[in-house]
């Protein structure tokens, strides 16, 4: 599933992308969040934006050199674990980010509470997000809050 976000009047507006043509018609997204993608969805992103996202099975490598690096094309690649505080099966979910000049791409296996909260806040508070870097920073600060709350319950 591809969720595409654009800024409208200082707020994040979300659009779900169901096919390649829908993806190609968007010219100014600031965040593209890819959840449990099909192989063809990753290909659409590559064709539309020239960005190769890692496949989910490739996210397992979390050696120091794979956590954060700048590629030859100038894109910043970051891999991070986010807590999923599920009562039955609490666990970490690995997320890969690719930050280009003006778009944040994220890819992960399942939707995360932190991501939902960031989307909600950015829709309700105009001006809280102005660009792709703001989205990334907001994801990390919200993750710190969520992780602290989860650990308090232990």
Model-derived features: where do they sit?
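Peripheral, non-transmembrane regulatory/ligand-interaction domains of membrane transport proteins
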Residues: 1-154
């Amino acid at each position: 599933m591809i969720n595409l976000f654009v800024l409208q009047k200082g707020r994040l507006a979300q659009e779900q992308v169901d096919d390649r043509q829908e993806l190609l018609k968007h010219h100014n997204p600031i965040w593209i969040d890819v959840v449990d993608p099909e192989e063809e969805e990753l290909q659409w992103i590559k064709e539309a934006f020239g960005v190769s996202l890692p496949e989910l099975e490739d996210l397992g490598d979390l050696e120091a050199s794979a956590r954060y690096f700048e590629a030859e094309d100038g894109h910043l690649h970051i891999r991070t674990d986010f807590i999923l505080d599920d009562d039955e099966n609490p666990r970490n979910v690995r997320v890969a980010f690719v930050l280009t000049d003006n778009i944040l791409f994220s890819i992960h296996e399942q939707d995360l509470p932190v991501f939902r909260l960031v989307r909600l806040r950015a829709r309700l508070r105009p001006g809280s997000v102005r660009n792709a870097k703001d989205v990334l920073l907001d994801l990390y600060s919200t993750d710190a809050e969520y992780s602290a709350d989860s650990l308090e319950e232990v």
